[in-house]
Amino acid sequence: MLLAQINRDSQAMAEFPGGGGEAQHVTLCLTEAVADGESMDTMEGMSLQAVTLADGSTAYIQHNTKDGKLMEGQVIQLEDGSAAYVQHVPKGDDLSLEDGQAVQLEDGTTAYIHHSSKDSYDQSSVQAVQLEDGTTAYIHHAVQVPQSDTILAIQADGTVAGLHTGEASIDPDTISALEQYAAKVSIEGGEGAGSNALINESESEKKMQIVLSHGSRIPAKPPQTNEKAFRCDYEGCGKLYTTAHHLKVHERSHTGDRPYQCDHGGCRKAFATGYGLKSHVRTHTGEKPYRCSEENCTKSFKTSGDLQKHVRTHTGERPFKCPFEGCGRSFTTSNIRKVHIRTHTGERPYYCSEPGCGRAFASATNYKNHVRIHTGEKPYVCTVPGCDKRFTEYSSLYKHHVVHTHSKPYNCNHCGKTYKQISTLAMHKRTAHNDTEPIEEEQESFFVPQPPDEVIKGSQITYVTGVDGEDGIQTTQSGQQLALIAQDGTSHVAIVAQDLSAFHTSATESGPQHSHNLGGSESRPVTLLATSNGRQIAVQIGEQQSLEEAIRIASRIQQGESPGIED
């Protein structure tokens, strides 16, 4: 079906005087299809009801003006809680629906997704939504029709005088004007169509659909839910669902009910959905059935949603756009967008309940990490043999883990350089490209620890003294070597010693012997950084500090500052 719409903002908007001297706003929509007498009858006496979608756009449903009832329809719930209605039309009628597939949205509701490439649609009419398993689907918003209208359907070579319009009435002047327009478009219609139209090969039979706006004279009828709509009765909610099951799942967000419990090794964590439990169990079993198909990428993931997020690090796709005017930022996941929106609204819904603390956070992750400061919990353990370091945050474990691998997961979008640490990438972008844009961290999506034997086989530690050879190769102790990143972003060799007793070097011809006893009786980790000008900086870090912080401290020393260990 071809729908060429002239909307209210266009220059083709016409005003026709009504019987009472009022101006009737007329919007004209052309529909090209094979004319059918029976389907023509169904168009008489129809009106439209507007419903607002999540992004502020409007969708329309058909009413039968004779009895005020909705045509057979399906209620779907969008992610912001608003309801949209899908019109079901029998196969063979002119108003045919696209094939759709039922999918579950992240809040348990159901939407229907068309099997088609989203690239075939105007991207401004495509809305990204996050599904329950973390994958992304796209809702296409069809061409919009003005609110509170009556549809009139006529043959392109016919007249409008005999049309039935239900409660509405059209004066003779309006009918005359419409007939003139019908004659005009029947002549011009074959000359070409707009860029957004699909040309119907059959020119032998046409019909014209005219939408007459009645303004406030005919009030819009409220949407009526059908027998398949299930409403949440909790105060202030009112969300609608297509099945009782989806409503029940949603109600758990109010009750806190988590009937799915993990019984793996005394874990006892509980979840609101079976899918949530299934995903969690894989953290115990290590199962990662979803593998990245990108060439030279060997990462795999627990869920298809995690894989889809990771793939965006290769493609650069960011389908979730910030709705605030003038912002223009977009994100790889709907959750990151939701947290970002709170930077506009100032919302911080997660409050620390520790007496005397009073801090609040915009994201649940930051809140959980903060609470561990009070509890002392360090649930994230490095699995590399002999390391056993523990961390309060998953991201800290990820940052630590790169010291055991050759991985450089962070890429500069300006020059293509790669880095082990996100902080080093940020420093490089600031100094080399004057880019201060925050870098999103999504380590959990693509942190895949290497097997212990691969770590031992592939990584070695080099102990650096004053040697400044042309090939950059330094004297090694214990045959282990690890390449790290210096302050200026180039690759240099650094020392990471877990214990001062394991750290010693001998003097060389190129430089004096260094003393690595930084004071104090307690044996603490030391990081020695080799910078681009040949200077070595030894940084002693505390138990809570990471290699990232050592690099930051060394950077400040390079600039002539004297930061303390706790700085």
Swiss-Prot record:
It is found in: Nucleus. A zinc finger (C2H2-type) spans 230-254, 260-284, 290-314, 320-344, 350-374, 380-404, 410-433. The keyword Amino-acid biosynthesis does not apply. The keyword Plastid does not apply. It holds the Pfam family zf-C2H2. SMART domains: ZnF_C2H2. Keywords: Activator, DNA-binding, Metal-binding, Nucleus, Repeat, Transcription, Transcription regulation, Zinc, Zinc-finger. InterPro entries: Znf_C2H2_sf (IPR036236), Znf_C2H2_type (IPR013087). Residues 506-525 are annotated as: Disordered. Its main location: nucleus. One of its GO terms (molecular function) is DNA binding. Residues 506-520 have a biased composition (Polar residues). One of its GO terms (cellular component) is nucleus. Transcriptional activator. Activates the gene for selenocysteine tRNA (tRNAsec). Binds to the activator element (AE) motif of the selenocysteine tRNA gene promoter. Belongs to the GLI C2H2-type zinc-finger protein family. This is Zinc finger protein 143. It comes from Xenopus tropicalis.
